Amino acid sequence: MRKKALIVDDNKNNLMLEKDLLEVAGFEVFTAEDAASGIALARKEKPDIIIMDMRLPDMRGSEAAKILLLDNETRNIPIVFVTASVLAEGIEEIKAIPNAVFIGKPINTRTFAKEVKRFMK
């Protein structure tokens, strides 16, 4: 059975690139362009991993992650934040979320899928 990945990013170019890379690596991929849709899809599809942008139009990715942590169905799903902001405050924000790590932008297309797999349980 293929692993499921959910990508939440409002930038269509990033979304399609990440989707293509994960599909080539064998993932079944679901996508959302805002946090609310991403939360709903996570609850419905129960992905093995979530790849989420930190800056979404309706809320920060870290806020969406905290909502997912409150739900027994989604609390243990690892989250990979993809962010251009690797400043200390952003890193601290991510460290405060269990099961969360980050990959800096721009992503490395050669290693992205491998990095995502490494963060899965």
Identify the role of each PLM range.
Residues 45-51, 56:
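Active-site beta3 strand of CheY-like receiver
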Residues 13, 33-37, 60-66:
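Acidic catalytic/metal-coordinating carboxylates
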Residues 107-116:
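C-terminal output helix
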